[in-house]
């Protein structure tokens, strides 16, 4: 009976992964190159890591101890100053609702939840796993044009990647909180 329950859980996790991928692809198709306002996703902060490499090591370690944690997303946290774009850390986030498919090994009380500020939102294609300064600067210009005052924090999620024209292209989901609505200029 235990074997069947474990097989069922693995099957349910596979379905959850497929639904996540389907949702990501739909969002890419709908939001690529468009700016909008969207709340930052509610998620469990599984780990705060110094950079993407440490995030990958942590992800592999956690995924091997708690089945299903491979569904965590890597959010690179950056700071935009108007002059520079600097990497701060990488967060491993597990979207709220996915914990239901992880089983008893996942103790949700051990993890804090993300805040859900309203953010300037877009999805962009990039040659890199991080956005560059110009990409974020364009986002800030859009915000100012619409009377929004962006904060310095930028969250970049590498949703997926593909190989085309002899290079890898990453689809980056970008969130940039704003602190107030200013008068449009």
Where are these regions (language model features)?
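A solvent-exposed interaction/effector surface
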Residues: 2-185
């Amino acid at each position: 009976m235990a074997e069947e329950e474990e097989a069922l859980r693995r099957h349910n996790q596979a379905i959850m992964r497929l639904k996540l991928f389907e949702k990501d692809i739909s969002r890419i198709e709908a939001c690529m190159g468009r700016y909008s306002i969207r709340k930052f996703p509610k998620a469990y902060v599984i780990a705060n890591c110094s950079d993407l490499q440490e995030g990958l090591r942590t992800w592999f370690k956690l995924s091997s101890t708690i089945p299903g944690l491979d569904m965590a997303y890597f959010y690179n946290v950056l700071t935009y100053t108007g002059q520079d774009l600097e990497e701060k850390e990488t967060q491993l986030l597990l979207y709220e609702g996915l914990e239901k498919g992880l089983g008893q090994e996942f103790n949700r009380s051990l993890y804090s939840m993300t805040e859900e500020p309203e953010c300037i939102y877009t999805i962009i294609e990039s040659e890199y796993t991080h956005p560059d300064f110009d990409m974020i600067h364009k986002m800030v210009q859009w915000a100012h044009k619409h009377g929004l005052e962006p904060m310095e924090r930028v969250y970049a999620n590498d949703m997926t990647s593909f190989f085309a024209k002899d290079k890898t292209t990453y689809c980056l989901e970008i969130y940039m909180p704003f602190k107030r609505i200013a008068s449009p200029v």
